[in-house]
Structure formats: C-alpha cells, structure tokens
Amino acid sequence: MIAYKGFNKNLACTKGKGTFQYQVGQTYKEKQAECASTGFHCVEEPIEVMQWYKNGRYCIVEALGDVHEDGNERISCSEIKILKEISLEQLGALECEWMRSHPERAYSKEVCRNTGEAKQEGIVVVRGKDPRAAGGLGATIFLLKEQSGEIVAAGAYKIDGSEYLPGMYYNVEGRKVRCRKMN
C-alpha cells in the first residue's frame, strides 16, 4: 500500500520512547503494528502528514507486512519502505490528485473549505464551489473547484511577487478576486 510519512528536518521521527532515524531507499521492520502504539506510522491521504510535521520533510512510503488502520487517518505497519522524498509543493499536488481520485471520501481538516491562506514558502489546498486563496511570497496555492462533490477544475499558483502577488486572493483560473486581505 502506497502511503505518506512526515519527519522532522533530520528525517527522524519519535517512535515509542525515542527517536528513530530513517533513510530514503531503506526498509524497516517491527514485530507488530497497532496505531498509536507500535509499528511504523504513515497516512493514506498525503496532506495528513502536516498534522504531525508541519515544517518537516515528507516521503512517499510503502506500508508492508501487518497493516493496522485506526479508522481515522493513521496507518501503522510492521514493515515500511521509504521510497522517495517529496517537496512541500509535490505534497500539495499529491493531495489534489488524492481528492480527485477519492471523491466520496471525507478529506483532511488540513484542506481549507472555500477560502485559505498560505504563509511565506508554505502551501494551502482549498476546495469548494468558488475556491480562493492568498499566500505569502514563495507560497504555492492549490485550488479545487467542486460541483456536486466532484472536482471540475483545479489550479496551482506560485506566489512569485510578479505575476502572483503576496496577500492577494486568486481563484481557480488564477485571476485576482476580492476577499479580505491577509494579515
């Protein structure tokens, strides 16, 4: 099962009573897996990693062996392979694809409804009937327009300071829209 894992800046995570160091390309094994208790934790919905590691590093992983799900967002597995490190922008794009591929599923609380803002160099994913977002310089905004629960249009824009300006709101077509200004 392909999943996503967040880490601190050193590609390490807290695990049990200590910190566990990971390396891309490596496979790790545990005897058992139970969410919030044992095993290696990851998530199916990409942006869920932000709940635990907002300013960390992110990887695509393969959850192997015994897999235990907590019924919410977490997965624990007895074996995990760290496949590839991804950027914050790639994480946002993967989240958009995940929502498009799973229209019937509830999506993460990390996804904003209708309006959102990203900090400088950050990301925001906004989904709604008329989504709009703003961001600080270097941020990337992801907008998903939906109709009857299906995504009908999408746009991603880098707040570069020239074509897309910090603090201005944009719609799914990349046009400036009126909305209260960012603080």
Question: Where are the predicted features?
Answer:
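Short, glycine-biased loop/turn motifs at secondary-structure junctions and
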Residues: M1-N183
